[in-house]
Amino acid sequence: MKPAMETAAEENTEQSQERKVNSRAEMEIGRYHWMYPGSKNHQYRPVPNLGDRAGPLSSPGCFECCIKCLGGVPYASLVATILCFSGVALFCGCGHVALAGTVAILEQHFSTNTSDHALLSEVIQLMQYVIYGIASFFFLYGIILLAEGFYTTSAVKELHGEFKTTACGRCISGMFVFLTYVLGVAWLGVFGFSAVPVFMFYNIWSTCEVIKSPQSNGTSGVEQICVDVRQYGIIPWNAFPGKICGSALENICNTNEFYMSYHLFIVACAGAGATVIALIHFLMILSSNWAYLKDASKMQAYQDIKAKEEQELQDIQSRSKEQLNSYT
C-alpha cells in the first residue's frame, strides 16, 4: 500500500505544478489585455525561436558533422605520409638523374674504354629500375598506412557509433608495426649508401678548389694534383686513364654534368634522410595506435560484462517488485 500512496502523492504534486504554470500564463495574458484594451480579440501566439528557422548554413547536424569529420583525420599520419612521399620523390628523382650524369662523366673522362666500366653501367641501370620499384611501392604503402590511421582514429574516438574492432584488425596493425620497423632499418642502409657518392664528388670538388686557389696558381705542382677514381672501386685498375690531374680535372669540375650530379646526390641523400624520419614517425604512430586498440578492446570487453551484469540486476529487481506487488 505504501508505494501506491507515494505514487498518488507524486501525481498530485505534478498536477498542482501544472495548474500553477497555467494560471501564471493566464494572468500574464489578462494583464496584457487590461493594459491594451484594443487587443482583446488578439490571440496569443508564441514567438518562434531562431533555432526553428532552418537555413542553408544552419541545417541540423551540419556543424557537428564537419567537426566529426575533422576529428577523424589522423593528422600525425597525414604529416608522416607527406614527409614520406616527399623524401621518396627526392631520392628517386634526383638519384636517377644523378646516376645518369655519373655514367656520362666516367665515359667521357675516366674510362674511355666501354668494356672497362660495362659492369658498372649494368649495376647503375639495375639501380635505376630499383628506384622505379621503390617509388611505386612507397606510394602504395604510404596510402595504406594513412588509411590504417583513419581506421584506428575512427575506432578509438568512436566516431561511427560504439567502439568496434576485431582481432584481425589488431593483428594487421601489429603487422604494419613490424613491416615499418624493417623498412626503417633498410632505409637507414639506403641513407648511408647514398652518402657514398656525395663523399666521392666532394673529394673531387675539394681537389678542384685546391687547384683554383691562389697558392696553387703559377706553380708546377698543379699538374701533380690528381684524382684517381679507381681507388673507390667503381672501375677496375686497368681502366684508362682512370686518373685525371691538373687543368683537365679543373675542366671536369666546370662541366654541367659534374655540377648537377654533385648537387642532385646531395638532395637524394637528404630525401633518404627525410624518408627515414617519416618511417620513424610512422613507427611511433603505429605503435601508439596498436596500444590504444589493445587497451580499448579490453575496456570494451569490461563494459560489455558490466552492462550485462547491470541488466541482470535490473531484471532481478523488476521480478522482485512484481512478486511484491502480487503479494500486496
Swiss-Prot record:
Recorded topology in the membrane: Multi-pass membrane protein
One GO BP: regulation of focal adhesion assembly
Presence of keyword Electron transport: no
Localization: Membrane; Cell membrane
GO annotation, cellular component aspect: membrane raft; plasma membrane
Tissue expression per record: Widely expressed. In the brain, expressed in neurons and oligodendrocytes.
SMART domains associated with the record: PLP
Glycosylation sites: 113, 217
Modification Phosphoserine occurs at: 318, 320, 326
This protein's UniProt keywords: Cell membrane, Glycoprotein, Membrane, Osteogenesis, Phosphoprotein, Protein transport, Transmembrane, Transmembrane helix, Transport
Region annotation (Disordered) ranges: 1-22
Xref: Pfam families: Myelin_PLP (PF01275)
Keyword NAD on entry: no
Membrane spanning stretches: 71-91, 130-150, 176-196, 265-285
Subunit structure: Interacts with SERT.
Family designation: Belongs to the myelin proteolipid protein family.
Entry function: May be involved in neural development. Involved in regulation of osteoblast function and bone formation. Involved in matrix vesicle release by osteoblasts; this function seems to involve maintenance of the actin cytoskeleton. May be involved in cellular trafficking of SERT and thereby in regulation of serotonin uptake.
Protein name: Neuronal membrane glycoprotein M6-b
Source organism (scientific name): Mus musculus (Mouse)
